[in-house]
Amino acid sequence: MITCLRIELSKAFRNGWFAVALVIGCAFGLGCAALYAIPSVFSTFVPNPDKFYHPTSQSCFNAWISVDTTSWALLFYQVLPLLCVIPYAWSFASERKDGYISHAYTRVGRGEYFFAKYVAVFLSAGAVAVLPQILNLVTLACFFPGYVPSIQDANYYAPVFWQSVGSFLFYNLPLAYVALYMLIDFLLCGAWAGFVLALSLVVHNRVILLTAPYLALLAIQFVNENIFFAIGKVRGFQLSLFENLHGSCSMYIQNGWIIVGEIAVFLFMAGLFWVSGGKRDAL
Protein backbone atom coordinates (compact mmCIF):
# COMPACT_ATOMS: atom_id res chain seq x y z
CA MET A 1 0.00 0.00 0.00
CA ILE A 2 2.70 2.51 1.02
CA THR A 3 4.79 1.75 -2.05
CA CYS A 4 1.79 2.08 -4.37
CA LEU A 5 0.82 5.38 -2.74
CA ARG A 6 4.37 6.70 -3.04
CA ILE A 7 4.46 5.80 -6.74
CA GLU A 8 1.12 7.49 -7.44
CA LEU A 9 2.10 10.65 -5.56
CA SER A 10 5.37 10.79 -7.48
CA LYS A 11 3.53 10.41 -10.79
CA ALA A 12 0.99 13.06 -9.82
CA PHE A 13 3.40 15.74 -8.64
CA ARG A 14 6.25 15.13 -11.06
CA ASN A 15 4.40 15.05 -14.36
CA GLY A 16 4.40 17.95 -16.79
CA TRP A 17 0.66 18.60 -16.58
CA PHE A 18 0.91 19.35 -12.87
CA ALA A 19 3.60 21.92 -13.66
CA VAL A 20 1.46 23.45 -16.43
CA ALA A 21 -1.59 23.81 -14.18
CA LEU A 22 0.48 25.20 -11.31
CA VAL A 23 2.27 27.73 -13.53
CA ILE A 24 -1.05 28.97 -14.93
CA GLY A 25 -2.49 29.27 -11.42
CA CYS A 26 0.59 31.08 -10.10
CA ALA A 27 0.48 33.45 -13.08
CA PHE A 28 -3.05 34.40 -12.01
CA GLY A 29 -1.87 34.85 -8.42
CA LEU A 30 1.06 37.08 -9.33
CA GLY A 31 -0.94 38.97 -11.96
CA CYS A 32 -3.77 39.82 -9.57
CA ALA A 33 -1.27 40.98 -6.96
CA ALA A 34 0.50 43.19 -9.50
CA LEU A 35 -2.75 44.66 -10.80
CA TYR A 36 -3.62 45.73 -7.26
CA ALA A 37 -0.20 46.75 -5.97
CA ILE A 38 1.17 48.76 -8.89
CA PRO A 39 -1.72 51.26 -9.18
CA SER A 40 -1.93 51.61 -5.40
CA VAL A 41 1.77 52.26 -4.89
CA PHE A 42 2.65 54.34 -7.94
CA SER A 43 -0.65 56.10 -8.62
CA THR A 44 -1.86 56.73 -5.07
CA PHE A 45 0.91 56.71 -2.47
CA VAL A 46 3.88 58.06 -4.42
CA PRO A 47 2.12 61.15 -5.90
CA ASN A 48 0.38 61.91 -2.57
CA PRO A 49 2.88 61.19 0.22
CA ASP A 50 1.18 63.57 2.69
CA LYS A 51 -2.37 62.34 2.16
CA PHE A 52 -3.93 60.11 4.81
CA TYR A 53 -5.39 56.77 3.82
CA HIS A 54 -7.38 54.64 6.20
CA PRO A 55 -4.85 51.94 7.18
CA THR A 56 -7.21 48.98 7.06
CA SER A 57 -8.22 49.78 3.48
CA GLN A 58 -4.64 49.11 2.39
CA SER A 59 -4.35 45.72 4.05
CA CYS A 60 -2.98 42.75 2.14
CA PHE A 61 -6.02 40.80 3.34
CA ASN A 62 -8.39 43.22 1.60
CA ALA A 63 -6.50 42.64 -1.64
CA TRP A 64 -6.14 38.86 -1.35
CA ILE A 65 -7.33 37.11 -4.50
CA SER A 66 -10.10 35.26 -2.67
CA VAL A 67 -11.83 38.54 -1.74
CA ASP A 68 -10.75 40.41 -4.86
CA THR A 69 -13.61 41.17 -7.26
CA THR A 70 -11.59 42.28 -10.28
CA SER A 71 -12.14 40.46 -13.55
CA TRP A 72 -8.84 38.53 -13.37
CA ALA A 73 -9.54 37.26 -9.87
CA LEU A 74 -13.02 36.15 -10.91
CA LEU A 75 -11.54 34.46 -13.99
CA PHE A 76 -9.09 32.54 -11.79
CA TYR A 77 -11.92 30.93 -9.83
CA GLN A 78 -13.85 30.37 -13.04
CA VAL A 79 -11.05 28.24 -14.49
CA LEU A 80 -9.88 26.70 -11.20
CA PRO A 81 -12.16 23.60 -11.42
CA LEU A 82 -10.60 22.91 -14.83
CA LEU A 83 -7.04 23.59 -13.68
CA CYS A 84 -7.31 21.22 -10.73
CA VAL A 85 -8.26 18.21 -12.88
CA ILE A 86 -5.48 18.76 -15.43
CA PRO A 87 -2.60 17.36 -13.32
CA TYR A 88 -3.79 13.79 -12.73
CA ALA A 89 -7.57 13.24 -12.94
CA TRP A 90 -7.11 11.74 -16.41
CA SER A 91 -4.54 9.16 -15.25
CA PHE A 92 -6.88 6.19 -14.77
CA ALA A 93 -8.34 6.58 -18.27
CA SER A 94 -4.82 6.80 -19.70
CA GLU A 95 -3.52 3.79 -17.77
CA ARG A 96 -6.53 1.70 -18.73
CA LYS A 97 -5.99 2.54 -22.39
CA ASP A 98 -2.29 1.66 -22.14
CA GLY A 99 -3.00 -1.57 -20.28
CA TYR A 100 -1.03 -0.46 -17.22
CA ILE A 101 -3.83 -1.22 -14.76
CA SER A 102 -3.74 -4.92 -15.69
CA HIS A 103 -0.15 -5.04 -14.44
CA ALA A 104 -1.02 -2.90 -11.40
CA TYR A 105 -3.81 -5.28 -10.39
CA THR A 106 -1.36 -8.20 -10.37
CA ARG A 107 1.02 -6.38 -8.00
CA VAL A 108 -1.46 -4.72 -5.64
CA GLY A 109 -5.14 -5.23 -4.99
CA ARG A 110 -7.73 -3.15 -6.80
CA GLY A 111 -8.73 -1.45 -3.56
CA GLU A 112 -5.16 -0.37 -2.83
CA TYR A 113 -4.68 0.84 -6.40
CA PHE A 114 -7.93 2.85 -6.39
CA PHE A 115 -7.16 4.35 -2.98
CA ALA A 116 -3.63 5.41 -3.94
CA LYS A 117 -4.87 6.84 -7.23
CA TYR A 118 -7.63 8.82 -5.51
CA VAL A 119 -5.31 10.24 -2.84
CA ALA A 120 -2.79 11.36 -5.48
CA VAL A 121 -5.50 13.06 -7.55
CA PHE A 122 -7.04 14.69 -4.47
CA LEU A 123 -3.74 16.10 -3.17
CA SER A 124 -2.48 17.32 -6.55
CA ALA A 125 -5.78 19.11 -7.22
CA GLY A 126 -5.74 20.71 -3.78
CA ALA A 127 -2.17 21.89 -4.29
CA VAL A 128 -3.04 23.54 -7.61
CA ALA A 129 -5.92 25.33 -5.89
CA VAL A 130 -4.07 26.54 -2.80
CA LEU A 131 -0.48 27.35 -3.84
CA PRO A 132 -1.38 30.24 -6.23
CA GLN A 133 -3.48 31.83 -3.48
CA ILE A 134 -0.60 31.57 -1.01
CA LEU A 135 1.74 33.14 -3.57
CA ASN A 136 -0.77 35.95 -4.14
CA LEU A 137 -1.03 36.78 -0.42
CA VAL A 138 2.73 36.61 0.16
CA THR A 139 3.33 38.93 -2.82
CA LEU A 140 0.75 41.42 -1.55
CA ALA A 141 2.28 41.30 1.93
CA CYS A 142 5.52 42.60 0.40
CA PHE A 143 3.70 45.85 -0.46
CA PHE A 144 0.93 46.20 2.13
CA PRO A 145 0.91 45.49 5.87
CA GLY A 146 -1.33 42.88 7.40
CA TYR A 147 -3.82 45.25 9.01
CA VAL A 148 -6.94 43.62 10.39
CA PRO A 149 -9.74 44.64 7.98
CA SER A 150 -12.52 46.88 9.24
CA ILE A 151 -16.20 46.10 8.76
CA GLN A 152 -16.49 49.61 7.31
CA ASP A 153 -14.50 48.38 4.32
CA ALA A 154 -17.16 45.82 3.34
CA ASN A 155 -18.91 48.05 0.82
CA TYR A 156 -15.75 49.52 -0.69
CA TYR A 157 -12.72 47.26 -0.48
CA ALA A 158 -13.59 43.70 0.60
CA PRO A 159 -17.14 42.47 -0.05
CA VAL A 160 -17.15 40.05 2.88
CA PHE A 161 -20.50 40.74 4.51
CA TRP A 162 -21.73 39.57 7.89
CA GLN A 163 -23.69 36.70 6.29
CA SER A 164 -20.62 35.42 4.45
CA VAL A 165 -18.89 32.22 5.52
CA GLY A 166 -16.17 33.08 8.04
CA SER A 167 -16.92 36.83 8.10
CA PHE A 168 -16.24 37.01 11.86
CA LEU A 169 -12.77 35.59 11.27
CA PHE A 170 -12.06 37.99 8.40
CA TYR A 171 -12.69 41.07 10.57
CA ASN A 172 -11.02 39.69 13.69
CA LEU A 173 -8.51 36.99 12.75
CA PRO A 174 -7.83 37.41 9.01
CA LEU A 175 -5.11 34.76 8.95
CA ALA A 176 -7.63 32.25 10.31
CA TYR A 177 -10.03 33.33 7.55
CA VAL A 178 -7.31 32.73 4.96
CA ALA A 179 -6.64 29.29 6.45
CA LEU A 180 -10.38 28.51 6.43
CA TYR A 181 -10.80 29.32 2.74
CA MET A 182 -7.58 27.54 1.86
CA LEU A 183 -9.05 24.46 3.51
CA ILE A 184 -12.41 24.91 1.76
CA ASP A 185 -10.77 25.28 -1.65
CA PHE A 186 -8.41 22.37 -1.01
CA LEU A 187 -11.30 20.07 -0.07
CA LEU A 188 -13.65 21.27 -2.81
CA CYS A 189 -11.07 21.00 -5.58
CA GLY A 190 -9.72 17.70 -4.29
CA ALA A 191 -13.20 16.18 -4.05
CA TRP A 192 -14.14 17.56 -7.47
CA ALA A 193 -11.01 16.10 -9.10
CA GLY A 194 -11.68 12.77 -7.38
CA PHE A 195 -15.20 12.78 -8.80
CA VAL A 196 -13.85 13.45 -12.30
CA LEU A 197 -11.35 10.64 -11.80
CA ALA A 198 -14.19 8.30 -10.88
CA LEU A 199 -16.07 9.28 -14.03
CA SER A 200 -13.20 7.82 -16.04
CA LEU A 201 -14.67 4.40 -15.29
CA VAL A 202 -17.47 5.19 -17.75
CA VAL A 203 -15.91 7.97 -19.86
CA HIS A 204 -12.95 6.71 -21.87
CA ASN A 205 -12.07 9.81 -23.89
CA ARG A 206 -9.73 12.00 -21.85
CA VAL A 207 -10.76 15.28 -23.48
CA ILE A 208 -14.43 14.60 -22.84
CA LEU A 209 -13.60 13.42 -19.32
CA LEU A 210 -12.04 16.77 -18.40
CA THR A 211 -14.29 19.13 -20.32
CA ALA A 212 -17.80 17.65 -20.01
CA PRO A 213 -17.98 17.91 -16.19
CA TYR A 214 -16.66 21.48 -16.42
CA LEU A 215 -19.37 22.39 -18.92
CA ALA A 216 -21.91 20.85 -16.53
CA LEU A 217 -20.62 23.19 -13.80
CA LEU A 218 -21.11 26.15 -16.13
CA ALA A 219 -24.69 25.02 -16.80
CA ILE A 220 -25.37 24.74 -13.06
CA GLN A 221 -23.97 28.23 -12.54
CA PHE A 222 -26.18 29.65 -15.29
CA VAL A 223 -29.29 28.05 -13.81
CA ASN A 224 -28.31 29.14 -10.29
CA GLU A 225 -27.88 32.75 -11.39
CA ASN A 226 -31.17 32.96 -13.27
CA ILE A 227 -33.71 30.65 -11.65
CA PHE A 228 -34.34 32.87 -8.63
CA PHE A 229 -34.97 35.86 -10.88
CA ALA A 230 -37.45 33.78 -12.84
CA ILE A 231 -39.25 32.56 -9.72
CA GLY A 232 -39.26 35.96 -8.03
CA LYS A 233 -39.47 36.88 -4.34
CA VAL A 234 -37.23 33.98 -3.34
CA ARG A 235 -34.01 34.45 -1.44
CA GLY A 236 -31.31 32.88 -3.56
CA PHE A 237 -28.52 30.63 -2.38
CA GLN A 238 -25.18 29.81 -3.95
CA LEU A 239 -24.82 26.40 -5.60
CA SER A 240 -22.09 27.29 -8.09
CA LEU A 241 -18.76 25.61 -7.39
CA PHE A 242 -16.98 28.58 -8.96
CA GLU A 243 -18.56 31.02 -6.51
CA ASN A 244 -18.16 28.78 -3.47
CA LEU A 245 -14.41 28.65 -4.11
CA HIS A 246 -14.31 32.46 -3.92
CA GLY A 247 -14.33 34.16 -0.52
CA SER A 248 -16.25 37.25 -1.61
CA CYS A 249 -19.77 36.92 -2.94
CA SER A 250 -20.89 38.25 -6.30
CA MET A 251 -24.60 37.48 -6.55
CA TYR A 252 -25.67 35.10 -3.79
CA ILE A 253 -23.93 34.70 -0.45
CA GLN A 254 -22.31 31.33 0.22
CA ASN A 255 -23.77 28.91 2.72
CA GLY A 256 -21.43 26.74 4.73
CA TRP A 257 -23.80 23.78 4.75
CA ILE A 258 -24.09 23.87 0.96
CA ILE A 259 -20.30 23.84 0.67
CA VAL A 260 -20.10 20.86 3.03
CA GLY A 261 -22.88 19.21 1.04
CA GLU A 262 -21.02 19.67 -2.25
CA ILE A 263 -17.91 18.06 -0.80
CA ALA A 264 -19.98 15.18 0.59
CA VAL A 265 -21.77 14.63 -2.75
CA PHE A 266 -18.50 14.53 -4.69
CA LEU A 267 -17.01 12.08 -2.20
CA PHE A 268 -20.14 9.90 -2.18
CA MET A 269 -20.41 9.78 -5.97
CA ALA A 270 -16.72 8.99 -6.30
CA GLY A 271 -17.15 6.19 -3.77
CA LEU A 272 -20.04 4.69 -5.75
CA PHE A 273 -18.01 4.70 -8.93
CA TRP A 274 -14.99 3.12 -7.25
CA VAL A 275 -17.12 0.39 -5.67
CA SER A 276 -18.63 -0.43 -9.05
CA GLY A 277 -15.23 -0.12 -10.71
CA GLY A 278 -13.75 -2.68 -8.35
CA LYS A 279 -16.17 -5.24 -9.75
CA ARG A 280 -15.32 -4.54 -13.38
CA ASP A 281 -12.79 -6.33 -15.49
CA ALA A 282 -9.56 -4.42 -16.02
CA LEU A 283 -10.02 -4.60 -19.76
What are these regions (language model features)?
Residues 27-93, 119-197, 201, 237-261:
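Secretory targeting signals
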Residues 21-26, 206-220:
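Central hydrophobic cores of alpha-helical transmembrane segments
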Residues 39-44, 93-96, 100, 139, ...:
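Membrane-interfacial segments
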Residues 16-17, 109-111, 115, 205-210:
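Membrane-helix interface segments
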Residues 1-26:
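Aromatic- and glycine-rich beta-strand/loop motifs that create alpha-glucan
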Residues 91-124:
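Helix-loop-helix units of permease transmembrane domains in multi-pass membrane transporters
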Residues 198, 202, 261-283:
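Junction motif at the cytosolic side of a transmembrane helix
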Residues 20-24, 115-116, 128, 212-213, ...:
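Hydrophobic core positions of alpha-helical segments in small-molecule transporters
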